[in-house]
Structures are given as structure tokens and as C-alpha cells.
Amino acid sequence: MKKLLLFVLIVVVLAGAAAALQYSRVREPYRGYEAAEQFVEIPQGAGSRGIGERLAEAGIVRDARTFRVALWLSGQGRKLKAGEYRFDRPMTPLEVIDKLARGDVYVVTVTFPEGLTMFEMARIFEAHGFGPADTFVAAARDATPIKDLDPAAKDLEGYLFPETYALPRRTDASKLVRLMTSRFEHVLTPDLREAAAARHLSMHEVVTLASIVEKETARADERPLVAGVYTNRLRIGMALACDPTVIYALQRMGRYNGNLHKADLSMDSPYNTYRYPGLPPGPIASPGRAALEAAVQPADTDYLYFVSRNDGSHAFARTYDEHKRNVEKYQVEYFRDLRAGRSGAAGGEGGAERELKPGAMAQARRSAARRP
């Protein structure tokens, strides 16, 4: 009898010691990996045993048993969320469980500014480590995601909505372009679609015009005015004479070096709006919400011309003679003064300290030459 009692006592003591050890480990920070950071993927539908084994293998917790004890103590067994998690410091099992219960998954924040082409977006995709740029371009060449919205689309240029995205580390190009086109469709509110229909504009025309507006001005107050200029030109059959469309053609041909030359304006491309009337074949960049709204709600104006003031704004004109005066003031005189080293050139920022870009005078002459 004494031996039985002794045996029971030993078992109780050992069990208590084991429980105490497990209890202490639950509250003991642990780090079993040598790298600066460790990533663990928790699959959808994974059970507590599988999660514990993954965490133990990655060195996040000491062992799967300790994790399960901690999970039982926490009462959060049904709250753990799937996803990829990043760990970079010692953590107790309870802290690990709290992280998984909150769904504090690791994401990469990526910003795609307004006005980028799909090729420029592809470089951002690659720069953030998601994969080669050409995989993004390949995915963007497939117009399937927006065929219901725009049957005329040849690719996703213009439909990859520009904004900041929080993405899982292993996001592939196909998944991202689907997300971006889905976001684009969400931005197309019923009011915006109704405004387009009221103006008898197809979605292809809306996005194409909006992309031009996006490239021409970054000022919110000017977008409706720029849209109004191009709407007026389209109405009377006047060439759009839009530099960004020519630049886009050169970019697609791999011939753009940062400068636009007079000879480029006669190049044979359907995107050359100096040579071919009407809108180009499709969007030349990804417009933001404001540019889309401007395209369907342009300013009610009789402006036909505009020219840069070299401070981010533009001077608008109704007649060609008025436009020529603006060009002389804000372009010809401005760059002439810069070359002469005079400070405070009209419309400039910093006078002679502002760098004179190659081809600026040629651009001024082009602006003066734009007419019906």
C-alpha cells in the first residue's frame, strides 16, 4: 500500500512539474531561427495541430505541444486566421496566438500613382519583389477581366486602377491585375456610368479621354477644363494635337528617350493625335477617379487651347491668337529668359535656377503651331 501511495505521489509530482514546465514555456519568449525575420504560411482550414507543427518547424514556438497548451489556455482556438505571417523577434506562444487571432498577416504596401502606363506599373511590380516585370505585362495584355465593361479593349491599359494596395508577399501578376481591374469597376459608380451614357460615350471612349486628361494635368481644378478643351475639339473635328499620345506611341515602340522632337509629330502611329483625328485607339495611361469624372463631366467652356505656365498650371484660350500670346508669354519668353540667365522668368519657379530641359523651345513652337 505504501509503495502504491509513493508511486501515485511521484506521478502527481511529475505531472505537476510537467504542467509547471509547460505553463512557464507558454509565457517564455522564444526564438529558434537565426535569420533576421521568418515567414510562416498558415493555410486556410488548417487545424491547431498542423499550425503548431508549422510554427515549431519555423522556430517560432519551442514545440507543437507547447503551442497547443497555450492555445487551450488562450481560448482562441477557433479564431486563428489563415495567411502569411512575419516574425522578427522572440515571442511567447500566447503572443504568437494573439497575432494569428488578430489576423496580423504580412502585406507589402505598393503605390501605383495615377497616370502610369502598364509598362511603368510592371516596373513597380518587379521593384517590390513580386516577380519579373514581363509577367505583369503579359497578364495586362489579357483584356478578359474587363471584356464585359469594354468589349473594344485590346489589353488592360487604362483599367489598372492606380492607388495604394496592401498585398501578400507572394501575389502574382494575374492576381494583382484582377484586383486592380476589380477596383476600377468599383470606382465606376452608377452616377459616373449614367453621366457617360448621357453624353453617348462608350466606356472605351471615357477611359481613353480620361487617360489623356490625367497625363495633361495634375491639378484637380484643371481636369474638367482640359477635358472640356478636348471635348470641344472632338465635337468640331479638330485634331487633339496631344503630346502625351505621341509619347505613348514612342514608348510602346521603345523609342522614347525623354524628349519629344518635331519629327516625332509626323510619325505614322494611330496614337499620333497630330496626324490622326479623334481619340487614339485606346487609353494611354491609368486615370484616377478625378480624371474619369472630368471625362464624363467636362467644364462647359469654349476653350480650344491651353499651354503650360511652367508652374504646374495652364493658360487656357478660346482663340488661336489668344493662344499664341499665351505661348509667347509662358513658353517662348520664359525659356528665352532662362537661357539668358535672367531670374523671375514669367510663370517660372526659381527663375534662372530652373533647369532648361532639352527641346523646351521646340515644344513652345509646337504649342504655337496647334490650330484647327
Language-model region placement:
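N-terminal Sec-pathway targeting helices
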Residues: M1-L14
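Polar/charged alpha-helical tracts
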Residues: K2-K3, S24, A138, A197
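Signal peptide-directed extracytoplasmic domains
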Residues: L21-L188
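Hydrophobic alpha-helical membrane-insertion segments, chiefly the h-region
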Residues: V13-Y23
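Bacterial extracytoplasmic/cell-wall-associated proteins, especially those involved in peptidoglycan
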Residues: G47, I124-G131, D142-P372
